[in-house]
Amino acid sequence: LTFAACQLANEQGKSDIENGLEQIGLQNVAEEIPGVEVYMVYATPYNFMGRVLYDGLDEAYLVPEAMEKLRKANELLRKKRMDLHLVVYDAARPRSIQQQMWKVVENTDLQDFVANPNKSGGGAHNYGIAVDVTLVDCTGHPIPMGSEYDYFGDRSRVDLETQLIETGEINQRELKNRQLLREIMTE
């Protein structure tokens, strides 16, 4: 029976990591929320590490409570802006990957942007309760937010938005896009 289950999972294209996440109760975003795209940035070399970190993790996984909040955010977005949709860049993250990320930023100016895996059990991503998302237009292009994903600098800080507007580092359109994303994710 175990062999048959493994064979079925492998036929469905799921890795051991993805099967493990499902076994502990995490859910696959693409399977649970139609219309939300998944582009796992750490499964590509296009991230702050410059290399593939998620070998065998191409799908986004969340705990059911986080999944429900993402579902509500998606529904709210569809009501407000039919021309936009959500893309998930990151969700549940293996602790071993968090440790690799921390090694790169530890004792640098960038360490405020990566959770220390040795404190409080690591970051929320390690438990499938955090999700990194952005908004894309109908052509699939991310709408301007004032900074790129994985940008580790002041332009990514929401607590500095007023200052960023005043200095011209972000513009009003980018601010409104950020506010829309925050609104749907927190309402």
Task: Identify the role of each PLM range.
Residues 1-4:
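Bacterial N-terminal signal peptides
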Residues 97-102:
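A short acidic (Asp/Glu
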